[in-house]
Amino acid sequence: MKYQDLRDFIALLEERGELKRIQQEIDPYLEITEISDRTLKAQGPALLFENVKGHDMPVLANLFGTPDRVALGMGQESVTALRDVGKLLAFLKEPEPPKGFRDALNLLPKYKKVLSMSPKSIKKAPCQQVVMSGDDVDLTKLPIQHCWPGDVAPLVTWGLTVTRGPHKERQNLGIYRQQLLGPNKLIMRWLSHRGGALDFQEWCQQHPGERFPVSVALGADPATILGAVTPVPDSLSEYAFAGLLRDSKTEVTQCLSNDLQVPAHAEIILEGYIEPGEMAAEGPYGDHTGYYNEVDEFPVFTVTHVTHRKDPIYHSTYTGRPPDEPAVLGVALNEVFIPLLQKQFPEIVDFYLPPEGCSYRLAVVTMKKQYPGHAKRVMMGVWSFLRQFMYTKFVIVCDDDVNARDWKDVIWAMTTRMDPARDTTLVENTPIDYLDFASPVSGLGSKMGMDATNKWPGETDREWGEPIVMSDEVKQRVDELWDELNIMES
């Protein structure tokens, strides 16, 4: 599905009745959050606020408010089609050698397409149609959303942060929230294991005391945004992956004040630097857990240049108790993760991140069990294979006769196939999201694995129960009689 930028995607949504323009004056202080939250919970459209109080710039919200819109942003017509995206990533992550000449010929188009999607650099970029620098930089002119009553300040939420570590060709793209600190200051909240933070750490080691170049794109196209939150193999840039999603090369342009390349068709670009040692207290903010997080210190991002398109659109969101946009993203990306996990663990049948589990904190896995202890191997694999699951606190493993997406099925398996002492695995002192205030130490906590599979010899000495199943003949006979019986007729 070809679209070049956010505006193309907005037009596509409007054609499909998936976008609502709001002309009434709406305050970015709390009101946009409340309207967006109600709309998302009703599985409503993306929202374009065209009359934002105190600003002449429209705000786009609830863009990824349904799994189908996430799929559309990734170039697919349905959520189930995202399995194909996952299969492509699994292939790129661990490509298998061709089994013969014919297989090699069949693989050629796939390799050719991947190699042809390197980003295209252009000079006269739409994102640099208007340029402000020095004293003209004033971030308060942006309609930055103040999401919750207890939030300390307005918060940039969909900023696509572009960094590059020393001696690295590939740039890193990441989504990190940024607290408004002043007219030209933001706080860059990135966790220590994220790509941007790692680039910064390496820079400080290689260039002590020198400013670290950073750029942030606001209002990038959906494929590029989603590429930044997808487990793209290290051999492939997020820009190239975005090109694969939308079936057209990502156009980029070099920043005015540094050598970073940003999406050429983004709505707004912030350019600047992080001064090593310049830190500020970030938070509290309402987060995806449904609670306000604790205050912590993060680097300060000083903005030296703001460039933007003519009549720019500001893209925003909020996070709160699920469901919110991160939870919806989790539901959609769940389908991308499954082929990646199956590549490493073919015995996995399904994998589910319930949205009420705050996107990633609880996972349910169903599998074709083959030997004693197999369930424990799979739960350990979930925690270790993809970095996206290093913060998953609970993993429940069931047999393939259980529907991972039906709590009635999962709870039945847990209560009939588990002994709490034997089948619960606790792992202490593991990485935990620092926003998880339930952990005893910030950033360090425990994990629980639950083996809700049928037990094999070696796992139990008792005779194991056999599930009750009606015979097919009787079921067929009753199917034929059912309408005639009129049991459900009032």
UniProtKB/Swiss-Prot annotation:
This is 3-octaprenyl-4-hydroxybenzoate carboxy-lyase. It catalyses: a 4-hydroxy-3-(all-trans-polyprenyl)benzoate + H(+) = a 2-(all-trans-polyprenyl)phenol + CO2. The active site is at residue 287. It comes from Idiomarina loihiensis (strain ATCC BAA-735 / DSM 15497 / L2-TR). One of its GO terms (molecular function) is 3-octaprenyl-4-hydroxybenzoate carboxy-lyase activity. Its EC number is 4.1.1.98. SUPFAM superfamilies: FMN-binding split barrel, UbiD C-terminal domain-like. Gene3D superfamilies: Single helix bin, UbiD C-terminal domain-like. Binds 1 prenylated FMN per subunit. One of its GO terms (biological process) is ubiquinone biosynthetic process. It is a peripheral membrane protein.
